[in-house]
Every structure is written in C-alpha cells, then in structure tokens.
Amino acid sequence: MGNSLFKGFSKPFSRLFSNKEMRILMLGLDAAGKTTILYKLKLNQSVVTIPTVGFNVETVTYKNIKFNVWDVGGQDKIRPLWRHYFTGTKGLIFVVDSADSNRISEARQELHRIISDREMRDCLLLVLANKQDLPGALSPAQITDVLQLDKLKDRLWNVQPTCALTGDGLLEGLAWLSQNAKLK
C-alpha cells in the first residue's frame, strides 16, 4: 500500500522539480554573432566560428528550463530554408549586429518575414542587439525603432543589448525568455 501511495505522488513531484523544455530558434543575418552566442551560453567560452552552413543545435539549461536552441545559418542563400525550422518554436532569438547600420534594414525585412509566418505567430521574440562593444553600435532604443518593433501587436518582445564575446546581456535574455515562457 505504501508503495502505491508513493507512486501516486512521484509523478507530480517529478514534474514539479524536473526541467521544462522550450524550443528556441536563433536567426539573424550572417555575421551577426549567432553561433558565438550559442557557444558562449553553452560552454561559457568564446569560440572561433566559421559561417554556419546548415545549423547547430545545443541544449542550454537556465533556471530549470532546458532551452533547445537551434542556430541556423544566416547567409542569404540559406534564409529561404529558415521556415523549415519554424514548427514547434516557442521563442525566436533574432540576433542583430548593432554596429552594422548598412544592413539593419535588411535585418528588419527578414525579421518581419519570419514573424508574419503563421507558425511563428505565438512565439516570444527576443532581439539580441549584439556587438554593443563596437563603436557606433545602435542602442536598444534605436534597434527598436529601426526594426519597427513598436508596431507589433499581440506579441511579447524584448530588445536586449549584448556582447557575445564577453557574454554581457546573454543571461538577461534567457531570464526574459524564462519569465515569459508559456511552458506546458
């Protein structure tokens, strides 16, 4: 009898204390810093990267949430394939090179194309305004303005200033995702 009583309690307790999972898609133009961010979060190290052809996927645990992060290459020839990764995505991390003002309108077009897809309708949007350590980097307020995020209705979004090389701002981004996640 005692054993069956324990079994009845073990399932709710395991759900209470186990890690929840959240599928995250990390996109952005090539050379924005996506892969550097992924491995800074995973290994807490800066790694030398090459342009991603295809994808990298890693699990990053933060405050008992397992973020399954899919980092997909950002070269223009690869971008049409992004939609194949949309299914099941709960959060979009869109990485912007804040110091590359020449490509910010291209980044805006790609972001709005992604979030207008019906499969991405309900996902959280975290914009990482990366490379804040570089001269001339746009501020989070400027990124918000240029990406026209204020026009987004019925979507939770946040702009987090980051520096992938030092890790500045990355954990704050995960904290925002974990606080706003609708985990099942």
Swiss-Prot record:
CC annotations in GO: Cdr2 medial cortical node complex; cell cortex; cell cortex of cell tip; cell division site; cytoplasm; division septum; plasma membrane
Molecular function GO terms recorded: GTP binding; GTPase activity; protein-membrane adaptor activity
Keywords of this entry: Cell membrane, GTP-binding, Lipoprotein, Membrane, Myristate, Nucleotide-binding
Organism field: Schizosaccharomyces pombe (strain 972 / ATCC 24843) (Fission yeast)
Protein name: ADP-ribosylation factor 6
Family annotation (InterPro entries): Arf6, P-loop_NTPase, Small_GTP-bd, Small_GTPase_ARF, Small_GTPase_ARF/SAR
Residue positions bearing lipid (N-myristoyl glycine): G2
Subcellular location: Cell membrane
Residues that bind GTP: 28-35, 71-75, 130-133
Gene from which this protein is expressed: arf6
